[in-house]
From Swiss-Prot:
Gene giving rise to this polypeptide: DDAH2
GO cellular component, one term: mitochondrion
Modifications made to the protein after synthesis: Phosphorylated by TBK1. Phosphorylation inhibits the translocation into the mitochondrion upon Sendai viral infection.
GO molecular function terms attached to this record: dimethylargininase activity
PANTHER family according to UniProt: DIMETHYLARGININE DIMETHYLAMINOHYDROLASE (PTHR12737), N(G),N(G)-DIMETHYLARGININE DIMETHYLAMINOHYDROLASE 2 (PTHR12737:SF16)
Family, similarity comment: Belongs to the DDAH family.
First-level EC class: hydrolase
UniProt keywords, alphabetically: Cytoplasm, Hydrolase, Mitochondrion
InterPro entries per record: DDAH-like
The organism's place on the tree of life at top rank: Eukaryota
Locations listed in the record: Cytoplasm; Mitochondrion
Name of this chain's protein: Putative hydrolase DDAH2
Length: 285
């Protein structure tokens, strides 16, 4: 059976999607977001892909940019993946729903079992779903409703699934993440702390917690691309981003920290976990 939580972060592949020019031409402004430097955003995205491939040793699958999908690089919202199963989401924004098509095909090609939501009353953004290795928490937010959370529970029946109110405009994973199999990291805002308190009440598992000054710093990815026994990685915001949170992240001594910047992509609403999907095509014990 193994140790509870040991499946967290197991991965062999990462999926990303290129940054289209349309990301800088109206989509952000229409959403009230600041102007975006396209070249810088594309550089950030290229560095992220390089770290996933070279530093973490993952097989990188890169979908081409599509001008009709300005927010296509935020493909973390399009699927929830655990083991060999991928739940294709139904994003809250109707304009984003075509983003799932290319992701679905890529995941099928990698051999994952595809589950469709199939309920027009459900909304689900993938970055509202936090998997701890033992259970799922689904943020009930502007982006994700109760029906979406119910479909997560129906899809991943081997795990407990609990809902957590998100009281800000963020997704759940924009407020908290996993710094290890037993450690929840969270921002210091009231919304982030409320979410962590709710999770503590709902869970049957004890998690340590680490509070970071910046909510966005808690949007990190705990990854174990190697074989069991090798040190895991924590892909996190750094490289000049969120300097106030870097010292606190050093307290996570059981991981190798891999910093990456996405401050320009953040202007389009991207958090770190929205910019890639990680999965394992290796057999699971």
């Amino acid at each position: 059976m193994g140790t509870p939580g040991e499946g967290l972060g197991r991965c062999s592949h990462a999926l990303i999607r290129g940054v289209p020019e349309s990301l800088a031409s109206g989509e952000g402004a229409a959403a009230g977001l600041p102007a975006l430097d396209l070249a810088k955003a594309q550089r950030e995205h290229g560095v992220l892909g390089g770290k996933l491939r070279q530093r973490l040793g993952l097989q990188l699958v890169e979908l081409p940019p599509e001008e009709s999908l300005p927010l296509g690089p935020l493909l973390g919202d399009t699927a929830v993946i655990q083991g060999d199963t991928a739940l294709i989401t139904r994003p809250w924004s109707p304009a984003r729903r075509p983003e799932v098509d290319g992701v679905r095909k890529a995941l099928q090609d990698l051999g994952l079992r595809i589950v469709e939501m199939g309920d027009e009353n459900a909304t689900l953004d993938g970055t509202d779903v936090l998997f701890t290795g033992r259970e799922f928490f689904v943020g009930l937010s502007k982006w994700t409703n109760h029906r979406g959370a119910e479909i997560v529970a129906d899809t991943f029946r081997d795990f407990a699934v609990s809902t957590v109110p998100v009281t800000s405009t963020s997704h759940l994973r924009g407020l908290c993440g996993m710094g290890g199999p037993r450690t929840v990291v969270a921002g210091s805002s009231e919304a982030a702390q409320k979410a962590v308190r709710a999770m503590a009440v709902l869970t049957d598992h004890p998690y340590a917690s680490l509070t970071l000054p910046d909510d966005a710093a808690a949007d990190c990815l705990f990854l174990r691309p190697g074989q069991p026994g090798l040190p895991p990685f924590l892909l996190h915001r750094g490289g000049g981003d969120l300097p106030n949170s870097q010292e606190a992240l050093q307290k996570l001594s059981d991981v190798t920290l891999v910093p990456v910047s996405c401050s320009e992509l953040e202007k389009a609403g991207a958090g770190l976990s929205s910019l890639c999907l990680v999965l394992s095509t290796r057999p699971h014990n």
